[in-house]
Amino acid sequence: MSRKILSVALLISLLMGTLWQTMTPTLQAAKTTAKWKTQKTGSAGVLIGKSVLVSIFVEDADSKWNEKQKKDVNRKLKVAAAFIQRQGKRYKKNVTLVADSYANPDLQYEVKTKIKLDDSEKRLNRFSDQMQTRIEQSVNVDEIREKYGTDSIGFVLFINKSGVSSTSVHYMEDGKKNFYEMSALFSKYENAAEGAATYAHEILHLFGARDLYMTSITDGISSALVRHVGKKYPNDIMFSTFTKNGKTLKYKIVNQVDRVTAFYLGWKNTIPEKKKFALGGRNPKGCFSDGTAW
């Protein structure tokens, strides 16, 4: 997960390629969008109530998608969405995550580019600003918000290559910048098929979840907290996306959302770890902050 970094696939694609969709919806008034873009949580908002995921399939000079592969990706996405909804119920939260872009074709887009894509951080930084502009111009967010009745929209970018998946999130301190929050999901990791648990892990970042397997000064994740989670919550999906035997499952998730992740998502108002590990307050829920806005 990264503050201002998204997978190079979309960033380059949006800059150099063409974004299209079979449908041509009508936009709402720009004033509505302007008001929506003042929310401190970024485009994905809070994972309570209804949220929508927009699927964007990326093709470059040496990779493309066929229909069978796209449906396979959509299957994993549906597994991830169902998992997240079940986890919400564990914390008595009503979570509806609309993610099936075949049942909802207005949520499926494609990107083409002649540039060869990879997951390098350097390119992600270079093209992130271009991505924000291009998505705003090409994706009908107003129509999506009106049709699905939500101000919670995340973007999932699918790249048919091996790479490290990542997510670009909005911080309170960003103001109007980096508003559109996106997860870039590679079809493979170390040349093995990626699993649904990684999809869920990256998607949860969109709504405020932190990586719990590594320290982060910006996000207030200390080495002591990482050790604590590893000992007490080793199956938390933000700590590990593997099974207890270290395996990756394509269409099944055996991990769960434990209380530290639930706190960051806004599903729990407080937890013992908040005081013990000096976790920052979350206001509003599900929001990222580097602490300078408090």
Predicted regions and their residues:
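Positively charged n-region of N-terminal signal peptides that target proteins for export
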Residues: 1-8
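Auxiliary, metal-adjacent structural segments of Zn-dependent hydrolase domains
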Residues: 132-176
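Propeptide-to-catalytic entry region of secreted or membrane-anchored zinc metalloproteases
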Residues: 30-149
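Bacterial N-terminal signal peptides
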Residues: 9-20
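Active-site recognition of the HExxH zinc-binding catalytic motif
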Residues: 197-212
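Short pre-active-site segment immediately N-terminal to the catalytic Zn-binding motif
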Residues: 181-199
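Sec-dependent signal peptide cleavage junction
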Residues: 18-31
